[in-house]
Amino acid sequence: MSEEIIEAVYRYSSFQNVPLMLIASRNQIDWDGGYVNNWKTPSYISFLSLLKKQYQNADILICRDHCGPLFESSKIKDVYKTIDSDIENNFHLIHVDFSYYDVDYQKKLEESKKAIEYIHKCNSHTLIEVGTDRNTGENLKCVDEIREEFSYFNSISPIAFFVLQTGSLVKEINQRGSFNGKYLRSIRSGILDKDLRIKEHNADYLSKEQLRERNGLVNSMNIAPCLGILQTMTTIQRCNIHGVNFEDFLEESYRSKKMGQMA
């Protein structure tokens, strides 16, 4: 995530008349700062407001990704500070994600429910994305478990997107997963709910053929690493073309240790 990538999203949406989502994780943008320009949430929103003036036809949903306890923290109070700031700054969608919370499955459901209810108490118009699975590319839940989980969350609040493992898995700069269309078809036929909208994470580095496989099965996809790789490669190529030494840039990038953070 960078200023250039963010502007590219607005520009593409405006010129192609395509609705898109900007979905920042807590590592990237948060109420107390993040690794993207060290922006706090209000600073990020101010930047987006400027882009909206420049690209008036852009149709962008401002979203929060992985709103739950992160790898290094289990502090629930910090999650709610994020929620408060997001709602105050008019985020359209919040992804409630307690998959990394170090408790049992039932407790994850309960904490997810509390967060969803709190969000809608603060703003009933905020869209909800939710799921309890870590995206590992394997160990897919059975259809009955998925049905029960979706019904549980949908009884609390209408769910805009339900996060499911699809078999996709990003490793370094490659898509190493194997899309399981049969699994998703069985889920759709098993749940029989026209409001089920599936969100796929780790959807980077997919070919046109792989994207076509998802038609009618996946409603929305998240990408991130491939955009960072694209910007880095473009920067290096431009440096080579114009004879600019980029060794210091690469060293600074390596020392930042940011490549392993949740996108």
Can you say where each PLM-predicted feature lies in the sequence?
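Hydrophobic faces of well-ordered beta-strands that scaffold small-molecule active sites
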Residues: 1, 20-24, 60-66, 92-96, ...
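Alpha/beta catalytic barrel-like cores
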Residues: 1-64, 71, 229, 233-263
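Gly/Ser/Thr-rich loops at beta-strand to alpha-helix junctions
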Residues: 2-4, 27, 68-69, 101-102, ...
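Short, acidic/polar
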Residues: 5-6, 74-85, 145-149, 207-211
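Anion (oxyanion) recognition and catalysis
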Residues: 14, 56, 87-88, 192, ...
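Short loop/turn segments at secondary-structure transitions that flank enzyme active sites
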Residues: 28, 86, 100, 168, ...
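Active-site beta->alpha loop and helix N-cap motifs at the rims of alpha/beta catalytic domains
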Residues: 31-124, 132-135, 139
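Active-site capping/gating regions of soluble enzymes
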Residues: 107-123, 133-263
